[in-house]
Amino acid sequence: MEILNAVSTDVKQIHQLIKVYADKGIVLPRSYLSLYQHLQCLYVMKEEGKIVGVAGLHVLGEDLAEIRSLVVDDQYAGNGIGRLLVNKVAEEAVKLGIQRLISLTYEQEFFAKCDFTVVSRHSLPEKVWVDCMSCPKNDACDEIAMIRFIA
């Protein structure tokens, strides 16, 4: 298995994998258009051509980025793929000069194992103003904001 930059021919598999978790309310859904528009920010773990994990890097400000759409195929869960994808995103973020990597998540225990700590969502104004204001869950957000300092 290896982590690669996503390419356009990966989008259908990426969409299908994200949809499984979006339908469960675990991650936000992503449209095909959104995936194509952010293709350069997506990383995939492949095994024999099959995408078994995906993660996105979304820059929010001068030193802040978010890990988005982190999902691993259920058949491969528990094998460290999620952690490898988080570390890949962190590595790429450092190359861009990013110092703080955040996630809004329901998976607090997983992200804690990846060196993230819980913070107030309101301590991340870049995220709140960019995305949260237009989210239907804004006033009743039940996701946990977590941060990892990477530089």
Regions from the PLM with identified roles:
Residues L124-A151:
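C-terminal "cap" of GNAT-fold acetyltransferases
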Residues T105-D131:
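Conserved active-site alpha-helix within GNAT-family acetyltransferase domains
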Residues E2-I14:
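A short beta-loop-alpha structural element at the N-terminal edge
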Residues G78-E91, S103:
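Conserved acetyl-CoA-binding loop-helix of GNAT-fold acetyltransferases
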Residues Q16-P29:
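Helix-loop element at the rim of GNAT/NAT acetyltransferase active sites that forms part
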Residues A93-Y106:
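Conserved GNAT acetyl-CoA-binding A-motif
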Residues P29-C41, K46-E47, G53-L64, R68-L70:
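A conserved beta-strand-loop-helix scaffold within acyl/acetyltransferase catalytic domains
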Residues L70-A77, Y106-E107:
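A short, internal acetyl-CoA/4′-phosphopantetheine-binding micro-motif in the GNAT/acyltransferase core
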